[in-house]
């Protein structure tokens, strides 16, 4: 029985490979478009929730994998999650600066919850908590993971010729067949490529931590200026409104960033 959707189903079936190949570029374009397009608070809430859920899933996968090549796509995942966090930071900063004077719920329920529930509505406490999280993420986890990735890449590349010679020796001795030798050579190459990629990808995590600090400072000073000059708010009103929203926004981005940093440290 023919249905109105049958031609569409055939088109999807015939172009499945093309669509799979285009999925990653389209995802990158969609993430980067969040930096440019204004997002309503409801969409921000959804994207922040997805961001936290993805960070948790990545950390759980990193915790339970047996060897690094089990998660060979991790450098790409690291790039995409970093881009998503930065895009959400830019989008939420835009909403905070444009609509912050209307009240604490201007940037959505998630930022409001982080600003009121986690730090008790006190922006000074929020700044202290954010500073502690930045120290943990930037100084402890990220710096250690970056050094581990650098050393792992160096030692893996140095050991690569020896591993390939060992495979050739086992093949010549008859301990393995040609098929197993090809598999082992491919595994050695993939391992070297993975650790080399992780050495570069760890810089994304470090840069993301620095960007979080700068975005928070820009949002605070920009919010003060907009609140006092454009909306005639007093200094205390501007502080209570914009700093609370800025700190809530920073915490929403910093917690997934910390989870991804821990995952990167586990992988390498």
Where are these regions (language model features)?
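Short amphipathic alpha-helical surface micro-motifs
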Residues: 16-18, 60, 248-250
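Generic start-of-chain signal for non-secretory N-termini
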Residues: 1-34, 41
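Juxtamembrane helix-loop transition segments at the membrane interface in multi-pass membrane proteins
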Residues: 2-13, 44, 59-80, 90-115, ...
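Residue-level signature of catalytic and energy-coupling elements of molecular machines
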Residues: 47, 85, 148, 201, ...
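Hydrophobic alpha-helical transmembrane segments
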Residues: 21-28, 36-52, 72-82, 116-143, ...
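Central hydrophobic cores of alpha-helical transmembrane segments in multi-pass inner-membrane proteins
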Residues: 29-31, 50-64
């Amino acid at each position: 029985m023919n249905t109105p959707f049958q031609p569409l189903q055939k088109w999807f079936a015939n172009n499945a490979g093309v669509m799979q190949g285009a999925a990653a570029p389209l995802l990158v374009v969609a993430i980067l478009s969040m930096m440019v397009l204004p997002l309503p608070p409801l969409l921000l809430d959804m994207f922040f929730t997805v961001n936290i859920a993805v960070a948790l899933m990545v950390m759980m996968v990193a915790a339970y994998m047996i060897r690094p090549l089990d998660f060979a796509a991790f450098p790409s995942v690291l790039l995409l999650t970093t881009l998503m966090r930065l895009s959400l930071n830019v989008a939420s900063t835009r909403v905070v600066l444009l609509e912050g004077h209307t009240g604490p719920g201007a940037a959505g329920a998630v930022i409001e919850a982080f600003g009121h529930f986690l730090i008790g509505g006190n922006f000074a406490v929020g700044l202290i908590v954010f500073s502690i999280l930045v120290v943990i993420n930037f100084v402890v986890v990220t710096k250690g993971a970056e050094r581990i990735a650098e050393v792992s890449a160096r030692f893996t590349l140095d050991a690569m010729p020896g591993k390939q010679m060992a495979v050739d020796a086992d093949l010549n001795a008859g301990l393995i067949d040609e098929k197993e030798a090809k598999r082992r050579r491919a595994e050695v190459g993939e391992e070297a490529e993975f650790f080399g990629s992780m050495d570069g990808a760890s810089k994304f995590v470090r840069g993301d931590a620095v960007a979080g600090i700068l975005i928070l400072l820009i949002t605070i000073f920009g919010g003060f200026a907009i609140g006092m000059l454009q909306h005639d708010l007093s200094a205390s009103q501007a502080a209570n409104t914009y700093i609370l929203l800025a700190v809530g926004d920073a915490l929403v981005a910093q917690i997934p960033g910390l989870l991804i940093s821990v995952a990167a440290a586990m992988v390498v």
